[in-house]
Amino acid sequence: MTIQKILKMKNKEKIVMVTAYDAPTAKILEKAGVDIILVGDSLGNNVLGYDSTIPVTLEEMIIHLQAVRRGAPNSFIVADLPFLSYGYSIEESVKNAGLLIKNGANAVKIEGGAQNCEIIQKCLNIGIPVMGHIGFTPQSLNMFGGYKVQGKEESAKKKLLDNALALENCGVFSIVLEMVTESIAKEITEKLSIPTIGIGAGRYCDGQVLVFHDIVGLNPEFKPKFSKMYANTFEIMLNAIEKFKMEVKDKTFPSKENVFEEGGK
């Protein structure tokens, strides 16, 4: 996959993007043939035990990005710039974006709208592709006052559209639309020449992204309306561990076939 191929998919073929935070997951996604692997700062919620993406550091992102690249050597990987790794300084923002590219990303994702255009253009000038992200932006959780759908009021719709157009003009190759009304997502998708990728943004985006853990049911108690659980992996893994525990306790594991004998194989 390349940026050029992603751009050509608009209005032709739906783009599939899924998160990964480690090598085994990345291997599964590459085998499945997803179009884009996202190393999201959502690793904070899904892997590191944080209650939001805000505590995630650049160093943590790099460690997980490296693991994903090792697991999916041939995939197109986008990595998030985490909170406080960009925005306060153009130079630091571009440097940190470059570190993600150096460590295995094909592109970086930056949350926010027109306010990031100077950073985006500086990144593009030195060869760093950028994916935009508007709507509900998790790093701004405290500003939103919680996980709230965006774009319900006319003023909010206008702001979303203005930011989408500004990002396209800045040179991003695609935009994630998160937790916005289906109507504004449809309008944005129709007015942009670059692909939109939705998460909780309805049926009319050019692609869809979901968190791996939500797809496979690793946290079955978390059931956001916009997501879908395709398997209950939590129960499968729990049953496996319980069986192992039981066999150790009743001394049926290890069995003869699991041990080494003198003169044997």
Curated annotation (Swiss-Prot):
Q: Which GO terms describe its biological process?
A: pantothenate biosynthetic process
EC code(s) of this entry? 2.1.2.11
Cellular compartments per GO CC:
cytoplasm
Q: Which cofactor does it need?
A: Mg(2+)
Identify the pathway. Cofactor biosynthesis; (R)-pantothenate biosynthesis; (R)-pantoate from 3-methyl-2-oxobutanoate: step 1/2
Where along the chain is Mg(2+) bound? 41, 80, 111
Name the chain's protein: 3-methyl-2-oxobutanoate hydroxymethyltransferase
Matches recorded under InterPro entries: Pantoate_hydroxy_MeTrfase (IPR003700), Pyrv/PenolPyrv_kinase-like_dom (IPR015813), Pyrv_kinase-like_dom_sf (IPR040442)
Indicate the quaternary assembly: Homodecamer; pentamer of dimers.
What Pfam families does this protein's entry cite? Answer: Pantoate_transf (PF02548)
Residues bound to 3-methyl-2-oxobutanoate: 41-42, 80, 109
Gene label: panB
What is annotated as the active site? 178 (proton acceptor)
Where does it primarily localize?
cytoplasm
Ranked from the top, the taxonomy reads:
Bacteria, Thermotogati, Thermotogota, Thermotogae, Thermotogales
Which cysteines are cross-linked by disulfides? none
